[in-house]
Amino acid sequence: MGPKRIPLVAGNWKMNFDHLEATYFVQQLAWNLRAIHFDYKRCEIALMPSFTSLRSVQVAVESDNLKIRYGAQAVSVTSQGAFTGDVSADMIAHLGCSYVIVGHSERRKYHPEDDANIVDQVRAVLAAGMQPILCVGESYEERRKGIELDFAVGQVHDVTRDLSDEEAAKLIVAYEPVWAIGTGMVATPQSAQDAARAIRNDLSDTFGTRVGETVRILYGGSVSSKNAVELINEPDVDGFLIGGSALKVDELTRICKLTLETTA
């Protein structure tokens, strides 16, 4: 964790929780964090619900003046019109969202989304005043070939190379090795650090050291309270994008607490 970067713990709920379950989870998480006197100024917490729960999460957060932030899991590259099923960045921003996940491996695989589309998503999110969380990471096959760092860095470079310095500085990168997502397998702290450092170096080479040292780089892939401390202790890991553990409110509370304590 870098000395000038505020850690971020983001929970990606994927296709889980209806709007009532989402509301209850937000209230319970806020209660848990209040009970331990959580300092949101030193560690940001964000939840990424499904589109159908965004409004409910907004109401829960705003009605109780909670410090928890939230965002969307996907976004359209178009602003409006005859695009059935799409949701624009402006629509998401009007619900008070701070972040939007772009380029997640599940979106790349099942929809599919390519780098050109992801570049447009990043620009749409930035234009709407939110921060994109750009997901990158290698498959097991790429790791077996020993090209995992080149692959992850290449994904970042292909998406960011045409951004301005100002746009790039607002980016958040989530390194999520595909083989670790939902498998119980987790990258070693050194592997996570190596990837984060390589990504940061590429950003510094492209946009200058100021931008490279400003961008927060998260780790994702079977994060739990058992491995959070050793991961966040790495100098270039600035937080987490969490899947399964973010569906369990007590476990997510523990990860938030450990992240804050370790980076204090």
UniProtKB/Swiss-Prot annotation:
Binding site for substrate: 12-14, 182, 222, 243-244
Localisation per UniProt entry: Cytoplasm
Record pathway: Carbohydrate biosynthesis; gluconeogenesis; Carbohydrate degradation; glycolysis; D-glyceraldehyde 3-phosphate from glycerone phosphate: step 1/1
Keyword Lyase applies: no
Keyword Membrane attributed: no
EC number(s) from the headed UniProt entry: 5.3.1.1
SUPFAM superfamilies registered for this protein in UniProt: Triosephosphate isomerase (TIM)
A GO term from the CC aspect: cytosol
Catalytic residues as annotated in Swiss-Prot or TrEMBL: 104, 176
Disulfide pairings: none
Assembly and oligomerization: Homodimer.
Family under the similarity heading: Belongs to the triosephosphate isomerase family.
PANTHER family, sorted: TRIOSEPHOSPHATE ISOMERASE
Protein name: Triosephosphate isomerase
Naturally occurring in which organism (per UniProt): Bifidobacterium adolescentis (strain ATCC 15703 / DSM 20083 / NCTC 11814 / E194a)
Designated gene of the protein: tpiA
